[in-house]
Amino acid sequence: MIRNYSFLSQLNEVKKDQTGTGLLIENDGHIIPPKDTISQIKEDIDSGHKFVMPDDFIVSAVFQKYGIKNANGRIYPENVLKTQVEKYIQERVATGCAIGALDHPQASSLSGHDVAMNILNLEWQGRTLVGEMKLHLSPGYKRYGICSTSGDLVANMLLDNILIGVSSRGVGSVKNQGGVLIVDDDYDIICWDVVMEASTPGAMIKLNRADLQPFIESKTHENTPINEKISRLEKILL
């Protein structure tokens, strides 16, 4: 089922360190270009060969984490985020329409010009949601390096070694519980977009799954005061 999010234009964004109900935007990752692919393209260009991009430009990513306080001061409980991710996988990823834009478009729905990538798969590793996305490239960019789509721009920035992020868009409520901002169970994922910033600690897009390992949060984590408070809350929330 594809949802209608036309009502989003009427919602206010719940900003950093705020409570309330509305649009929740989390900048959750960085894109780092696939080294072998980028090196080969640059080598071909330097050698005077024809500019050719691979047919499938795919990168791995950390998309989001549960139980970890992000830069917006919010924590997504395990049951809330896992439930919504599973729904997103069934409704979007499995049907080949898990598309995202470059930057968050002002409109509530994507046009063809907005599409920058399509998420191919998502899976959990501990507290961390990882997966792969395929950049949406035009024939003109693949053959001649001419940018005409958002996906072309993303690929071109990766060629220039620019760090790019991934950001989730969703709708839901944030409540203050014991001094910690918790995303409530009315949360609903809309999509992930490609952006220029990130808010989830250590969430990055990498060459492959092995490169993601240093940024993946396991079920057990350091017993700092904030983590101890979070753990106590999780026993109530999960």
Residue spans of the language-model regions?
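Residue microenvironments linked to proteolytic maturation
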Residues: 4-19, 120-222
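Short, surface-exposed beta-strand/loop "edge" segments at domain boundaries and coil↔beta transitions
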Residues: 65-75, 106-111, 138-146
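A glycine-rich, hydrophobic loop/mini-helix early in the fold
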Residues: 88-123
